[in-house]
Amino acid sequence: AGEVEKREGMMKQIGGAMGSLAAISKGEKPFDADTVKAAVTTIGTNAKAFPEQFPAGTETGSAAAPAIWENFEDFKAKAAKLGTDADIVLANLPGDQAGVATAMKTLGADCGTCHQTYRLKK
């Protein structure tokens, strides 16, 4: 797969992981520590690898905003923050639904902050 497809796949994996966490935090699915750990691990791993998925020459053909390449250091910092916050959640793995909801607020805010600036509106 090309770079665009690869990074879109990584984003979809994060979206799926966030969906799993959301279902637990809302009580739609029962709390399961293994599910939470796997979801947060996916988020952290993918976030840390994001900056390498946006090489020069891949600025078109996706929802990636030109601002990524114009402000690459800030983009990298935002990806790193998501990775670090995921590591913090993993180190203090939530033990119940409320803990997952708290973790979701932090991770979701990281996603939103980056998407607001660096994802084109559909």
From Swiss-Prot:
One Gene Ontology term, aspect cellular component: periplasmic space
Key words, A-Z: Electron transport, Heme, Iron, Metal-binding, Transport
Pfam families membership: Cytochrom_C_2 (PF01322)
Record carries keyword Heme: yes
One GO BP: electron transport chain
GO molecular function: electron transfer activity; heme binding; iron ion binding
Complex and partners: Monomer.
Function, in words: Low-spin monoheme cytochrome c.
Protein name: Cytochrome c-556
Taxonomic lineage of the native organism: Bacteria, Pseudomonadati, Pseudomonadota, Alphaproteobacteria, Hyphomicrobiales
